[in-house]
Amino acid sequence: EGQMEVASIVSKPVEGVNAGKIENIELVSRAIREAMSEAEEQLGIRITEAYAGISGDFVRCARHTDHVFVYDPQNGVNQKDVDALFDRMRNVQAPDDETIMERVPQNYVVDDNQEVKNPVGSFGKKLSSTFNFILCLRTPMQRLDMALKRLGIKMLGVTSNAIATAEAVLLPDEKEEGVAVVDIGGGVTDVAVYYRNVVRYIATIPMGAMAINRDIRTMSVPEKHVESLKQKYGSAVADLAPEDKLIRVNGRTAREAKDILLRNLATVIEARATDIAEFVLQEIRDSGYAGKLAYGIVLTGGSAKLKDVDELFRRVTGMDVRIASAETGVAEESREKVVDPAYATAVGILLKGAEQGACAVIERPASPASRSAEPRPGFQPRQPQDVPEFRHMPRFQQPAQGPASAAAQPASDEDAAARGQEREDEQLKAPVIEPKRKRDWGSIFQKTFDKINKSFTAAEDEEI
């Protein structure tokens, strides 16, 4: 039924990554090797190819509008006109330091005034469309490829984590009626906005769970206890935490044990979580679809498990919020394996890879083998360029011709030649997407601690 069975899922901590960017290839390769070796041992297979996901503030979207002249206006738009428009979009160039990962059509417009879902059969002289280009800086993508190549793994393709996550958690009605997917990861928070079944906007906020953990450490909590303290006793909404309940956190010795008021812990968590929610809201507004998201926000990622985080997002954004794990496209018998929202992105990457025809090629050795940096003898991995850039180019059905269209005369040879020349002239132009404008994130940390200090000061004033 087109659903995916998850055979194994392995998660390993990784160092050498900062806000999604690989800073130490050796450490990243080591973590990938450990995870893959464990999965191979569980399943008795050897993995030689991978489809990857990437995330960071170096991934962005940019819109570009272009048009073609309809080849035979008297008989209306046909599939060749749509294909010609897609060819035009193939010619759009990224800035020198970026590469285009995906091109997503947003709409079709005939003669600048009639927006249609299916342009084939519409009458007009010009067919236009706006495409959403998903771009990534070349350097982070090259480092990801290098980390995999060190293990003899061929990277068949790469997708935006924001889009992959959405594919795993969203329901059809949510995609159609409007929703924002918010994936709160360790180093970054990804946002993807969907409307009318199309991804309209993606963005990455360079902070996530690790920023919250760093704030908790300022309460003199040992690093090894931070995550468990946050998950077991933390809350993203301070006024929902107990006012007078204490929790003892052990230090290296009994003498260093520390009592922490849960309300204070929640105050620290809420300050940073509010920052994240406010920046998410700003990205949703920047998308231009804030007023069209009937289904509000879908939260996922490891930090979606934080107590009351959904309530915090409701208060900050004023939108409906639900917490989701990977269910879309996953076979029912596999859903228990991926019930943790932290696995949503990994499942989404698998779904995107299968959609692009980049399913991993595996073999079953007689006995589990250790990972080698060399592919098996005679193995010819699929090349990334073999995956079509427009795998889902729409193939619209030509409407049945009625009496009016049947009586229409085809364009003259002169008109057809003129249209052809116009298309050739257009093909010579290669538009370049504008470089990214950097957002200023510099004030967020001071802003967070100002909130914390204000809250603590107010509490002290009340005691006095």
Predicted regions and their residues:
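Short beta-alpha connecting loops at secondary-structure transitions
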Residues: 200-201, 210, 214, 261-265, ...
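Acidic, glycine-rich loop-and-beta core segments that form the ion-binding/anion-interacting portion
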Residues: 168-242
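Glycine-rich phosphate-binding loops at beta-strand->alpha-helix junctions
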Residues: 55, 136, 235-237, 292-316
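Glycine-rich phosphate-binding/hydrolytic loop that grips phosphoryl groups
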Residues: 324-376
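Adenine-nucleotide phosphate-binding core of ATP-dependent small-molecule kinases
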Residues: 147-161, 248-290
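Short acidic loop-to-helix transition motifs that present clustered carboxylates
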Residues: 160-167, 211, 328-331
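Phosphate/pyrophosphate-binding loops at sites that engage ATP/ADP/AMP, CoA/4′-phosphopantetheine
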Residues: 35-48, 277-295
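Nucleotide/phosphate-binding catalytic cleft detector across ATP-hydrolyzing
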Residues: 2-50, 54-179, 222-223, 228, ...
